[in-house]
C-alpha cells in the first residue's frame, strides 16, 4: 500500500518534475556548445544506419548531437525521479514557512511530544468520563489517553483558577455548562482545549464548516496568550469521531481538516512568533499523506 501511495504521489508530481528537468536541460543546452555533443560518438553505428535510410540530407554529426541531447534529457529525468521517490518514501515531516510563522506537520504521537506546549482537545463541556457511550470519552482518543495518564486532573479547579466564565449559551447536551469552542485552560505545560460542540446525544458535531473555522480562529487567539515563547503541538482537530455539517454531519478526512487548519492559521493575525513553531501532529492513515502538503 505504501509503495502504491508513493507511485501515485510521484505521478501527481510528474508535472513539477518535468519543469525542473526542462529548466536544467535548457541551461545545459544554452551554455554547452553543440560541438561537445557532437564529440560523443556512441551512437555512430545508429547514425550511419539512419543516414543510410534517409539519405545524405542528415549528417552523422547532427544525428549524434540529437541522440546525445535526448540521452542527457533522459538522465536528468531519471535523477530527478529517483530523488523524488527517495523523498516521498522517507518523508516524516513538512515545514511551511511564512513571513511571520513556521508550521511543521509531521507523523507522531502528540502525547510523546517534548519541549513544547501540548494542546489536548476536549469537548465544549470538558467531559472527563471515559467509556463507550456516545457521551463518553473514548479510551483510544487522545483525550481519553491523556485522562488515563492524568487520573487526578481537576478541570473544574483549573477553570476556577483562571476565572474562566462559561458561555451564556448552554450545551445542547442536557443543557450543561459549556465553554466557547477554542477556549484554552492551562494545566501545567499542557493546554486543555474546549473544542467540539455536543449534540443532544453527547456526540461532537460542528453544525457547519463556519463554526469549525470560527473555533480555529479563536484557538489561534488563545494560543497567542498562552504559548509562552515555546513551540506548540496540536493534533488534527476534529479527525476522531467529531462530525461537521448539518444534521448529524459527516466525518471529514484528515487531509481536508489539515488544509483548513493550515489555511486558517495563515489568515489569522494571531500566530506563534518565530523562531517558535506550530507543530501539527498527524497519525498515519490511508486517506492521509504528508506528500500532499506543499512545503515552502
Enumerate the language-model features and the residues they cover.
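Macrodomain-like recognition of ADP-ribose-binding/processing modules
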Residues: 2-296
Amino acid at each position: 500500500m505504501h509503495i502504491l501511495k508513493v507511485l501515485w504521489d510521484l505521478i501527481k508530481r510528474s508535472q513539477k518534475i518535468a519543469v525542473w528537468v526542462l529548466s536544467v536541460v535548457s541551461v545545459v543546452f544554452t551554455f554547452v556548445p553543440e560541438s561537445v555533443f557532437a564529440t560523443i560518438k556512441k551512437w555512430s553505428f545508429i547514425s550511419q544506419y539512419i543516414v543510410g535510410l534517409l539519405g545524405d540530407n542528415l549528417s552523422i554529426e547532427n544525428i549524434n548531437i540529437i541522440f546525445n541531447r535526448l540521452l542527457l534529457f533522459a538522465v536528468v529525468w531519471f535523477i530527478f525521479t529517483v530523488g523524488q521517490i527517495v523523498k516521498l518514501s522517507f518523508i516524516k515531516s513538512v515545514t511551511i514557512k511564512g513571513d511571520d510563522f513556521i508550521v511543521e506537520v509531521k507523523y507522531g504521537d502528540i502525547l510523546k511530544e517534548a519541549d513544547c506546549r501540548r494542546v489536548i482537545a476536549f469537548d465544549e463541556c470538558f467531559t472527563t468520563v471515559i467509556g463507550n457511550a456516545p457521551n463518553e470519552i473514548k479510551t483510544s482518543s487522545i483525550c481519553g489517553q491523556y485522562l488515563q495518564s492524568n487520573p487526578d486532573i481537576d478541570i473544574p479547579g483549573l477553570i476556577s483558577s483562571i476565572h474562566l466564565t462559561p458561555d451564556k449559551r448552554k450545551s445542547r447536551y442536557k443543557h450543561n455548562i459549556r465553554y466557547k469552542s477554542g477556549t484554552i485552560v492551562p494545566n501545567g505545560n499542557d493546554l486543555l482545549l474546549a473544542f467540539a460542540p455536543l449534540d443532544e446525544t453527547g456526540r461532537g458535531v460542528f453544525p457547519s464548516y463556519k463554526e469549525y473555522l470560527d473555533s480555529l480562529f479563536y484557538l489561534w487567539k488563545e494560543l497567542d496568550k498562552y504559548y509562552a515563547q515555546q513551540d506548540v503541538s496540536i493534533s488534527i482537530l476534529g479527525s476522531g469521531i467529531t462530525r461537521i455539517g448539518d444534521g448529524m454531519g459527516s466525518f471529514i478526512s484528515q487531509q481536508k481538516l489539515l488544509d483548513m487548519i493550515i489555511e486558517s492559521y495563515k489568515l489569522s493575525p494571531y500566530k506563534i512568533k518565530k523562531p517558535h513553531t506550530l507543530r501539527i501532529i498527524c497519525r498515519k492513515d490511508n486517506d492521509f499523506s504528508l506528500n500532499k502538503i506543499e512545503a515552502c
